């Protein structure tokens, strides 16, 4: 309808001759088609618009229309056309000197290059990188222009442009795999957009960061954190439902990839029930949700299935694997399929029954890019299918396809197809069809490898069988797909998208309990009085507060009066979370009965780190609460956003607890219950197999703490500030429960002990149970009276919600945003009670209190509210606001103040509370009189903290250095730098020499007092040098630390390296466990220039160890890892590890004789393109199982020494290699034995490429050239020798195993290359004949070393070898020697074999 209206307007404008209106109509139609996804139609309209404006001379409008044409072509993936139109747009903008449009043009052009680079990522690595660099260049130009736009556009538009440029550059850096730079740029975009409330852009940045962490860094925790932030921003939009659903889709995908299907189900159900207006998103959500629901149902069934019912377990694991494949979580699918195979074997299944499992495994390994494993299971399937020729044929065709895809040698793939043909001949009725398919594919393979002779033979065979291969080529693929392995896939994969009533999902699946957006149910009671649900400034309702304080009766009354059960505070916590976190089992049970069961697996709001009530209970040691939740249906498989399971939280609590036998048994029983559930669904690892005891919990805790100082404990508390748990003293609670209920007035001794306990642990929960006298004294009404409501703590929020602080972890301190309860008790103590207390307090206890006070000041974990007084007469009236509402919190001060005498001469005691301030206030002490419940009116005096902590950043470590306030003027910056270095040493074992700077880079003098840095939020430390022990001493220290034996031979070599900065550990055949202390000792040995580890067995594991130290060897120029059993995974860990960009001087990389495989080529390309690879000039890859170099660039153009010998390269790879190598720079080149297959055609093609290589440059720098086994002939060698004649420093030439060479070549070499010292021509039997022997006599200069294969039968004259020997001795004197490899001449036979002619016999090997 809308389209017709636009078309009608366009026709009317055209008939009226109004070209302006026609252009406007074209623009409107183009926008309409763009929104509908009809990009071709949009292009047509925008082109018309541009033509009309161009004919009218309106250049700016023409430029804008061309930009839209370019954007449409971009969406159609026609990037070249898009670039043409946007470049036109850019030219017009420049001509008009319109900087705003010029900036937009550069940004648009950068986006086209970015998308083009993404599209080339899988096909052409070099092309992709080129496009990404162009994108970066254009985005940077766009960024530079923004600064010149001041005054032309508003400040907000300018900032929006700047932030978008930073985001775009960040995305480019992500695709260039410069992840750290990408994060830095996106962070800049986030800061600008958040500061200036550009929420749409902020949301986009958070989503980009989330995808970066999950897709590139595989860090689900960070990805979820950014996703949660995006979710908070999405709630600000007018179209928030659409944005929220988009964000929830991303969050669900992250959880699916992490294998947390229960959490993904909650998120997708929430998204489904929001009913996004975007149809594509709605279909995607529904499809994903159906699959996830079925996976969760299968997991539930799996938990209930007997562990010996192998047949049922096999079926369930198969369903789970299929579901994970549909969700594209192939890693998890492989885990389930392996378990399926295990259960099939336990069920005594064998033979054909295993085929579906092998099919599932190979398909999934193939989808996951693990082709070697896929081939392994394909061959197993083939072994079982040999009696079924058609199935065996399909399997072999798949094997050949994968081998061809992985660039396996031609003959390997050829042999597989030959086997397939033999199986096709046995296939009976479908034999002809299968033979056609095999022949078509085999012919395609031969043509790809230029096997013309084989193609002709195959076509002749096909013709003899009545098959026209040209005709069958077009239909071969269709028949293959219809008759191939598709049936097996369909049988193996159930229909996961069949009908399932999503409306049956309950609210418990939705986890969408944000009651603030829904009308609250209000219950009308007698007298039309209703319960008004109020929230304090933390968002806590009366029910939250009652659950925190453990008031069961109040909880029951609030619910009966209509209080919503599932209501969130500002941070996202439910009352159920609070009750579980504080361990009130009766309250938990009541809440579950009254409607909280729907939220039993709730993960809180976006600020709650995905913590469920069950995790709350487990991590705080409330075992009975955890058992209750499990009995009522809590899902133990739900993980937090930090990927922690309930069992991990339980074990973390157990490490800090001492349990008696009964408690230990309860803990072990609960743990076993959780472990049984988690292990069945494949979550728990073997390390969690045994429960902790008091003994090993202490040991583990000691190992984790190690040698941490008090201040490091504070650092740990800050580091864990985003986590939370409630410290709970179990023994104290039990003690409190045993007290006599009738005793309402404690004795003085008990009061004294209570005071001492609070002084020692000011943050500890009150262990005494709340007094029940008041509750028993009065009969409760059905309603809350005005006096029963703690009016001081309730303030109607008319300012807007204050973000509730996240729960934090501070060791033994409370790590919860909920308020702690303290009773303020009037103590009847003597007048000199202060002196007695101070004398009774040991010095170490005082220091312990100081430490805890510092922790409280640092963490400021929560605002802690007071309980009602236990006195029946204490009541408070409602005031407008209280200190607590202003953000203050309370805990007991470390020491009481002195008493004051009353007017009548009696002594009255004043109890003291220190109210912890927020960031804008000082500490306030409030004095409480025993005779009154209200504070005494005294002047509040600020009390400064006794210590000041400086934050210092050293590389990637953040340190806190506390200093007593009174010493600030006596300590200088030098002391602070030394102390920070000492603490860094405790963390890493290395001591740096530091210079401290401000955050913006201004350096302090060493003599400056430390007080000048008080205003700095963080100090940056630059490392001037390292205090490092000699390498051999470091090795001994590492061996001692790791409890390994010191190898004296290694130690001696390490000592030698100190003299020449070259560490040579070649030929020791050490494995990874032996090299680990060596690699740790290498950390920060910055003067080391050469590291030679040739001929060891470090493998991939050793590479991971070395990768930690390698970036710190800043002067390293040569890394030799020849013959170390290193694969592609080890190479990736080594070259793509964090910090490798700092290794900017590495010139030589020797990886010879390692099974790297083709997968390593991408890794090497990435490394060579990085800053660390820019200095690389020597690359050695001999015998590394390489066959296909694809389009990757290993920095060939800048190499001076290159060795890729003994790798069977394809002709296409050789062509690309010779095109990229630079003969102007090369000094050493080894291309021996790289051709494949070994036929005349490939030899000729390789020789032609070699000639092209030498012709492409000056060849002046060559010192050594090795071309053995390259299929060279005389013509090729003539051309090559002509070019090598320019290399005046040429020392060695190896042309061995080129059997087509004749004596003519030897003549060329001796004439053209007189500077040659070594000539190797082994197995070139036709090289030396009578003519060449005479030529040798005439030459004045010969190579000093000549290795030839000689056949005396070639010579017509007798005594050819004697003549040769005399020539040699005449040239080089008595030291010259001729060596043979057999004694045939001594027994009168003619000699045939290797002949070595040496100028100096002492050089003989």
Swiss-Prot record:
TPR repeats: 23-56, 63-96, 163-196, 203-237, 245-278, 314-347, 355-388
Bias-annotated ranges (Polar residues): 841-850
Name of the protein in its database record: Tonsoku-like protein
A single GO molecular function term of this UniProt record: histone binding
Low complexity bias spans: 859-874
Subcellular location: Nucleus, Nucleoplasm; Chromosome
Family annotation (SUPFAM superfamilies): Ankyrin repeat (SSF48403), RNI-like (SSF52047), TPR-like (SSF48452)
Ranges of the LRR repeats in the UniProt entry: 153-181, 439-465, 1085-1108, 1113-1137, 1143-1166, 1186-1211, 1287-1311, 1333-1357
Family to which the UniProt record says this protein belongs: Belongs to the Tonsoku family.
UniProt biased composition (Acidic residues): 469-483
The protein's role, per its UniProt record: Histone reader involved in homologous recombination-mediated repair of double-strand breaks (DSBs) at stalled or collapsed replication forks. Specifically recognizes and binds histone H3.1.
Any Pfam family matching the protein: Ank_2
BP GO terms, sorted: chromatin organization; double-strand break repair via homologous recombination; replication fork processing
Repeat region (ANK), residues: 538-567, 571-600, 609-638
Segments for region (Disordered): 465-535, 695-753, 806-827, 841-880
Lineage: Eukaryota, Metazoa, Ecdysozoa, Arthropoda, Hexapoda
Swiss-Prot/TrEMBL keywords: ANK repeat, Chromatin regulator, Chromosome, DNA damage, DNA repair, Leucine-rich repeat, Nucleus, Phosphoprotein, Repeat, TPR repeat
Residues bearing the modification Phosphoserine: 707, 709, 893, 895, 899, 902
Compositionally biased spans, kind Basic and acidic residues: 813-822
Residue ranges crossing the lipid bilayer per the database entry: none
């Amino acid at each position: 309808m809308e389209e017709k209206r636009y078309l009608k307007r366009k026709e009317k404008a055209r008939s009226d001759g109004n070209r302006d209106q026609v252009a406007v109509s074209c623009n409107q139609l183009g926008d309409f088609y763009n929104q509908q996804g009809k990009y071709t139609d949009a292009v047509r309209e925008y082109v018309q618009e541009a033509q009309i404006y161009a004919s009218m001379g309106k250049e700016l409008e023409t430029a804008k229309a061309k930009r839209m044409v370019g954007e449409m072509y971009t969406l159609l993936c026609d990037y070249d056309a898009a670039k043409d139109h946007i470049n036109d747009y850019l030219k017009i903008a420049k001509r008009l000197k319109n900087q705003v449009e010029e900036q937009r043009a550069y940004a648009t052009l950068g986006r086209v290059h970015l998308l083009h680079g993404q599209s080339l990522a899988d096909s052409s690595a070099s092309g992709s990188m080129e496009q990404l660099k162009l994108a970066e260049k254009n985005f940077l130009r766009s960024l530079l222009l923004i600064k010149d736009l001041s005054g032309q556009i508003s400040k907000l538009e300018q900032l929006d442009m700047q932030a978008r440029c930073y985001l775009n550059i960040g995305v480019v850096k992500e695709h260039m795999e410069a992840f750290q730079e990408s994060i830095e740029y996106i962070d800049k975009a986030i800061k600008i957009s958040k500061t200036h409330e550009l929420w749409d852009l902020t949301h986009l940045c958070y989503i980009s960061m989330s995808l970066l962490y999950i897709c590139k860094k595989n860090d689900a925790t960070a990805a979820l954190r950014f996703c949660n932030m995006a979710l908070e921003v999405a709630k600000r939009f007018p179209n928030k439902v659409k944005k929220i659903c988009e964000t929830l889709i991303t969050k669900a995908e992250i959880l699916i990839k992490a294998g947390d299907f229960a959490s993904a189900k909650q998120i997708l159900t929430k998204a489904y029930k929001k009913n996004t207006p975007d149809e594509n998103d709605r279909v995607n959500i529904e499809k994903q949700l159906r699959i996830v629901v079925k996976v969760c149902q299968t997991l539930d069934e799996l938990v209930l299935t007997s562990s010996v019912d192998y047949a049922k377990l096999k079926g369930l694991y198969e369903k789970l694997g299929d579901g994970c494949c549909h969700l594209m979580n192939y890693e998890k699918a492989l885990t389930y399929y392996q378990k399926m195979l295990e259960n099939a074997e336990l069920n005594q299944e064998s033979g054909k029954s295993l085929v579906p499992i092998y099919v599932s495994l190979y398909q999934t390994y193939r989808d996951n890019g693990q082709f070697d494993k896929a081939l392994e299971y394909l061959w197993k399937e083939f072994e079982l299918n040999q009696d079924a020729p058609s199935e065996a044929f399909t399997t072999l065709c798949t094997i050949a396809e994968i081998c061809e895809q992985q660039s396996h040698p031609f003959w390997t793939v050829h042999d597989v197809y030959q086997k397939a043909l033999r199986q096709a001949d046995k296939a009976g009725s479908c034999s002809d069809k299968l033979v056609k398919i095999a022949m078509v594919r085999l012919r395609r393979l031969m043509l790809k490898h230029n096997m013309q002779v084989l193609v002709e033979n195959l076509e002749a065979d096909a013709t003899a069988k009545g098959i026209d291969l040209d005709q069958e080529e077009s239909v071969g693929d269709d028949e293959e797909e219809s008759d191939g392995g598709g049936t097996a896939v369909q049988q193996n994969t159930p229909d996961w998208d069949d009908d399932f009533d999503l409306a049956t999902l309950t609210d418990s699946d939705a986890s969408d309990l944000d009651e603030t957006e829904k009308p609250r149910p209000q219950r009308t009671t007698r007298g039309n009085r209703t319960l008004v649900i109020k929230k304090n400034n933390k968002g806590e309702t009366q029910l939250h507060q009652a659950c925190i304080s453990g008031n069961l009766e109040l909880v029951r009354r609030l619910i009966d009066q209509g209080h919503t059960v599932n209501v969130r505070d500002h941070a996202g916590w439910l009352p159920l979370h609070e009750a579980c976190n504080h361990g009130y089992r009766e309250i938990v049970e009541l809440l579950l009965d009254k409607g909280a069961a729907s939220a039993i697996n709730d993960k809180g709001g976006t600020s709650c780190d995905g913590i469920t009530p069950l995790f709350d209970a487990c991590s705080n040691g409330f075992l009975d609460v955890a058992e209750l939740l499990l009995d009522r249906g809590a899902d133990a498989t739900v993980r937090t956003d930090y990927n922690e399971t309930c069992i991990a939280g339980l074990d973390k609590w157990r490490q800090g607890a001492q349990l008696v036998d009964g408690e230990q048994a309860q803990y072990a029983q609960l743990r076993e219950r959780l472990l049984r559930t988690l292990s069945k669904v494949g979550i728990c690892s073997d390390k969690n197999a045994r429960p902790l005891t008091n003994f090993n919990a202490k040991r583990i805790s000691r190992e984790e703490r190690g040698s941490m100082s008090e201040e490091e404990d504070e650092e740990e508390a800050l580091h864990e500030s985003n986590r939370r748990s409630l410290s709970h003293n179990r023994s104290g609670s039990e003690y409190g429960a045993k007290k006599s209920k009738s005793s309402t007035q404690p004795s003085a001794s008990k009061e004294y002990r209570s005071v001492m306990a609070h002084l020692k642990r000011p943050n500890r929960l009150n262990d005494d149970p709340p007094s029940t006298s008041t509750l028993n004294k009065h009969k409760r009404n059905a309603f809350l009276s005005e006096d029963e409501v703690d009016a001081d703590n309730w303030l109607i929020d008319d300012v807007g919600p204050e973000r509730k602080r996240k729960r934090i972890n501070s060791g033994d301190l409370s790590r919860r945003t909920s308020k702690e309860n303290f009773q303020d008790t009037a103590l009847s103590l003597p007048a000199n009670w202060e002196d007695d207390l101070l004398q009774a307090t040991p010095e170490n206890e005082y220091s312990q209190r100081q430490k805890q006070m510092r922790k409280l000041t640092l963490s400021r974990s929560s605002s802690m509210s007071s309980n009602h007084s236990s006195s029946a007469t204490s009541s408070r009236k409602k005031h407008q606001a209280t200190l607590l509402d202003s953000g203050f919190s309370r805990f007991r001060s470390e020491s009481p103040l002195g008493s004051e005498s009353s007017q009548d001469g009696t002594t009255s005691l004043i109890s003291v509370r220190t109210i912890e301030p927020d960031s804008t206030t000082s500490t306030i002490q409030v004095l409480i009189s025993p005779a009154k419940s209200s504070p005494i009116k005294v002047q509040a005096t600020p009390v400064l903290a006794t210590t000041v902590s400086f934050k210092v950043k050293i590389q990637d470590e953040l340190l806190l250095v506390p200093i007593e306030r009174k010493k600030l003027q006596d300590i200088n910056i030098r002391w602070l730098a030394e102390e920070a270095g000492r603490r860094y040493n405790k963390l890493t074992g290395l001591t740096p020499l530091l210079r401290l700077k401000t955050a913006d880079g201004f350096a302090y003098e060493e003599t400056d007092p430390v007080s000048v840095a008080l205003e700095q939020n963080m100090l940056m430390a630059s490392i001037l040098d390292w205090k490092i022990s000699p390498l051999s001493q470091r090795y001994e220290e590492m061996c001692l630390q790791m409890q390994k034996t010191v190898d004296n031979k290694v130690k001696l070599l390490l000592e030698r390296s100190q003299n020449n900065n070259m560490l040579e550990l070649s030929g020791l055949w050490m494995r990874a466990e032996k090299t680990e202390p060596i690699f740790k000792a290498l950390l920060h040995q910055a003067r080391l220039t050469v590291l030679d580890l040739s001929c060891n067995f470090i493998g991939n594991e050793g590479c991971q160890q070395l990768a930690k130290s390698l970036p710190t060897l800043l002067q390293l120029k040569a890394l030799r890892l020849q013959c170390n059993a290193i694969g592609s995974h080890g190479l990736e860990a080594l070259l793509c590890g964090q910090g490798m960009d700092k290794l900017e001087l590495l010139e030589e990389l020797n990886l010879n004789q390692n099974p790297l495989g083709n997968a390593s080529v991408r890794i090497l390309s990435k490394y060579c393109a990085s800053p660390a690879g820019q200095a690389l000039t020597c690359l050695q890859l001999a015998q590394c199982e390489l066959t296909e170099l694809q389009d990757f660039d290993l920095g060939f153009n800048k190499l001076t020494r290159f060795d890729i010998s003994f790798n069977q390269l394809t002709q296409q790879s050789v062509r690309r290699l010779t095109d990229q190598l630079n003969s102007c720079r090369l000094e050493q080149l080894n291309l021996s034995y790289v051709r494949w297959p070994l036929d005349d055609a490939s030899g000729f093609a390789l020789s032609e490429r070699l000639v092209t290589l030498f012709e492409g440059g000056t060849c002046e720098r060559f010192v050594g050239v090795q071309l053995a086994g390259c299929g060279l002939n005389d013509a090729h060698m003539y051309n090559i020798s002509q070019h090598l004649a320019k290399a005046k420093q040429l020392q060695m030439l190896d042309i061995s195993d080129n059997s087509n060479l004749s004596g003519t070549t030897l003549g060329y070499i001796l004439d053209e290359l007189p500077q040659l010292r070594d000539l190797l021509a082994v197995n070139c039997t036709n090289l030396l004949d009578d003519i060449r022997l005479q030529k040798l006599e005439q030459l004045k200069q010969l190579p000093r070393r000549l290795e030839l294969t000689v056949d005396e039968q070639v010579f017509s004259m007798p005594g050819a070898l004697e003549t040769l020997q005399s020539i040699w001795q005449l040239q080089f004197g008595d030291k010259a020697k001729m060596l043979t490899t057999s004694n045939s001449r001594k027994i009168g036979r003619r000699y045939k074999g290797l002949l070595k002619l040496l100028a100096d016999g002492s050089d003989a090997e």
